[in-house]
């Protein structure tokens, strides 16, 4: 699979870590949705707009003809997933790409309905595997990520840092 559909939280984490540019060195077609972009702060939008202009990140607009289905997914699962979550789930299901998220509720929901989900640790593993990151940068970013996001699986990060 050569397609990644991004939820907001992973994009935000990569911007906070100041390593978003490494993401777009990966050989994947990358999308997010207009609803996810709307969730971002103006500065985060400005950063991503650079990659959108370079066609490295594509915005998948939910068309009016699709909105009823996305809204139904959201309404039937309100309190579990947000509307932007429903959009990235819908796009991942429709396009067949990996859904990238750090949101546990979205992960469980998407997996329940057959969408393959990956997280930020997988993404860093990919950047190392594809030699986008050196081993030292990989470990440095994982350490910063662990400090920034204590909800991540500490054991998984620790075994990669050693």
Language-model features, listed with the residues they occupy:
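Acidic, PIN/NYN-like endoribonuclease modules and their adjacent C-terminal/linker elements
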Residues: 46, 107-162
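Active-site-proximal, substrate-binding regions of enzyme catalytic domains
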Residues: 2-97, 104, 115, 140-142, ...
